[in-house]
């Protein structure tokens, strides 16, 4: 199984594509498709049918679409840069992610 260095609720920056440079929070990681849903990034218009049972009106709705995981990088809170994530073990044996630019622990 592949190891994903991006997790839900991470702050990420888009590094390529039409939304290059935008920063957002990861809403969902789609592991089977190698994609992530990022808040307010790669937004498309979708036509929604009205659902009277759930009191949902119909119309055109903006919806976030998945973006490939290779097109985003994790933002480090300490150095405020888009960075590659590495893994290491702490003294007590716990595996943690760290920023490869400033060596600060991310989570």
Swiss-Prot record:
Protein name (record): Large ribosomal subunit protein uL24
Gene for this chain: rplX
GO cellular component term of the entry, any: ribosome
Function comment: One of two assembly initiator proteins, it binds directly to the 5'-end of the 23S rRNA, where it nucleates assembly of the 50S subunit.
Keyword set, alphabetical order: Ribonucleoprotein, Ribosomal protein, RNA-binding, rRNA-binding
Family (UniProt): Belongs to the universal ribosomal protein uL24 family.
GO biological process terms on file: translation
Quaternary structure, from the entry: Part of the 50S ribosomal subunit.
InterPro entries named among the record's database cross-references: KOW, Rib_uL2_dom2, Ribosomal_uL24, Ribosomal_uL24_CS, Ribosomal_uL24_KOW, Translation_prot_SH3-like_sf
Keyword check for Protease: no
UniProt source species: Oleidesulfovibrio alaskensis (strain ATCC BAA-1058 / DSM 17464 / G20)
Molecular function in Gene Ontology: rRNA binding; structural constituent of ribosome
